[in-house]
A protein has these predicted regions:
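Amphipathic alpha-helical dimerization/coiled-coil segments
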Residues: 1-13, 82-117
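Alpha-helical interaction segments
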Residues: 7-9, 46-47, 65-69, 86
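N-terminal helix-turn-helix DNA-binding core of bacterial DNA-binding proteins
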Residues: 12-53, 76-85
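Intrinsically disordered, low-complexity regulatory regions of eukaryotic regulatory proteins
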Residues: 21-22, 70, 115
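Alpha-helical residues within the helix-turn-helix
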Residues: 45, 56, 62-63
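Beta-hairpin "wing" of winged helix-turn-helix
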Residues: 62-72, 79
Length: 117
């Protein structure tokens, strides 16, 4: 069982990660990066987005550490962070893995006032 603070951090980080994965363009970008490093210009050709929109998506993917970037001259190259991608995969598995059941004893039942006729 997680303490309140650990719970918030664990699920908060997982929620940010899944939010980053919750866009079809970002999923497509990640699938392209599965095959290796890509220049932003190559991504632009395939995703059919404007340059500012691609930059927005890449910022989100980089902030969640799913993607790393490096600049070479005027070009930016992006790569899939396989360690972080593996953690995302594990987070999804953990979410649906059978766990210790939560107590079904409802506290409000014991706090109810007795019913009167």
């Amino acid at each position: 069982m997680c303490s309140g603070r650990q719970y918030d951090m664990e699920y908060g980080e997982t929620a940010k990660l899944f939010k980053a994965l919750g866009d079809e363009n970002r999923l497509y970008i990640l699938s392209m990066l599965q095959h290796g490093e890509r220049c932003a210009c190559v991504l632009l050709e395939h995703v059919h987005l404007s340059q500012p929109t691609l930059s927005h998506h890449m910022k989100i993917l980089c902030e969640t550490h799913l993607v790393t970037s490096r600049k070479e001259g005027k070009w930016v190259y992006y790569s899939l962070n396989r360690v972080r991608a593996g953690r995302a995969e594990q987070a999804l598995k953990d979410l649906f893995q059978e766990k210790e059941p939560v107590s079904d004893a409802c506290r409000c039942q014991s706090e109810r006032l007795p019913e009167t006729d």
